[in-house]
Amino acid sequence: HRLKVGYSAWTNPFNGVKSYVSYQNTRFIVFWSKNPAPLISHLDYLKERNIDCYIQFSLNDYEKEHLERGVPPLHFRIDTFKRLVDKLGKGRVIWRFDPLLLTTDISPDKLLQKIENIGDQLQGYTEKLVFSFADILTYRKVKSNLEKNNIPYIDWTEEMMCDFARRLVQLNKKWNYQLATCGEKMSFDGVAHNHCIDDNLIIRLAYNDKTLMDFLKVKTYPMPTADIFGEIAELPNDAIILPNSQYATHGNNQDKGQRL
């Protein structure tokens, strides 16, 4: 696997330029996958290398509609999710239902039922649900693939998205997950905008890694205690609560990587 080799190479299909990524100084990896089961056997190696991680697990349910070919059955993927959490911890595996796709066979009601089924089974195993609405008309390749496979899609309207988000927030009252959208311009009450690479989460998970924290420009402070009048100072708006009776703040970490 590429970590043992020490680097990865990628050739840009448009201009033929080859780029290299070195893993010599890697401290943290964020994984995205619809089927991260093969990763489980490599997690101990990451630990040996002192490389921390979290996983964005796209756990959808389009099984009956055969829209995601090549992924294992839903029950297997839910079991994989739980095995990953047992290995890594609840905060390190994020549930994504992405994208939310409407067809003549999949109504908003049916989508909510699919989400509820998975959400009920993941209670106690995740803290967060990230979702996005399939923007089919914007992505010609997606539109072409759906039409090629005779899948009669329905594009989301703003009114439909707002209503769906409202109903999902209501549904979430029994789970209390953090709800967040991915790549959506619209805002919805009770739903945050997700970060693809969430530096706040990385800090919360890897606050003991001084090298990484220095790179992320993190400063830590003791949690405020009551003064002689019993008053407790308010935390800053950007405070990240750590598990060691401290909180952290950080600088602007946007796009620290170099693109060749």
Model regions: which residues?
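Short, surface-exposed amphipathic charged segments that create phosphate/polyanion-binding patches used
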Residues: G70-V71, K143-E147, H193-L201
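Surface-exposed cleft-lining segments at the edges of enzyme active sites
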Residues: E63-V71, P99-D109, E147-W156
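Short, solvent-exposed loop/turn segments at secondary-structure junctions
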Residues: P36-A37, N60-Y62, L100-L102, I136, ...
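Catalytic beta/alpha-barrel core
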Residues: W32, S132, D155
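C-terminal accessory extensions appended to soluble enzyme cores
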Residues: E158-L260
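Active-site glycine-rich loop that binds ribose-phosphate moieties when present
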Residues: Q113-N117, W156-C162
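Conserved C-terminal portion of the radical SAM core fold
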Residues: F76-K143, R167-G183
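Conserved Radical SAM active-site core
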Residues: H1-L67, L74, D79-K90, G257-L260
